[in-house]
Amino acid sequence: CPPCTQCRVAPASGSNPSVAEMSTLFDRIAAGPQAYGTLGWNFGGRTTVGAGPGWCGTTGRRDTVPVTFPCVLLKAIYLTESAWRQFCTTNQTVISFDCGYGIAQVTSGMRRGETSSYDAARVASSAAYNVSVGAAILADKWRASPCVGLNDPEIIEDWYFSVWGYNGFSFRNNPNNPMFRADRPEFRTPGVASAQVRSNYPYQELVWGYSRYPLTSAHYRGIALVYP
């Protein structure tokens, strides 16, 4: 995983936590910055999100709640992004061609000449901090995305458009894009039989597939999700 020469921060040296350690880490980050404290980034103070259909132009509750995430959602997103790797086999930070760093493949503010409100060096060096920044970006997508269902952040399926937005809210990830077969089967991860080619699916369907079919049973217990 060679770093892009246009990236802001040099790769850090380190080793990946074990699968069990990563699973525990995701559980802690999913509880939100008010729970995990100095383990990660504080989301720049943006520690609440809107919940309820009242935010969607309809009647119903319109609450503001602390940011939390369904645990399996974070685990599935970051299997999709990096297979839970902060560091390459060379013990250097995973950095993609477009300056995506680490487990969460954080790109915002990570290109040369850009700035960020979070510590870019810690994004490169710390698995916990990296994941917390990725979670903050996902929370921002929730705030900016169309509502699904009851607009309840405790329901994984209600994050559908937020997950789409995490990879870019573009036509490339539109499930009706003609580049994808209309009769495509659900995505199955490389860790199970009948795995499919990732490029044949929009991003959010990869995450839904990883949610049901983790790489191994040690990662988490798979959950089948429905589509909006």
PLM regions and their residue ranges:
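Extracellular/periplasmic catalytic domains that process cell-envelope and extracellular macromolecules
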Residues: 1, 66-71, 96-99, 155-157
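Non-catalytic cell-wall polysaccharide-engagement segments
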Residues: 1-36, 107-228
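Short secondary-structure capping micro-motifs at structural edges
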Residues: 61-62, 89-93, 115-122
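Structural recognition of the beta-strand scaffold that forms the well-ordered cores
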Residues: 73-79, 85, 102-107, 138, ...
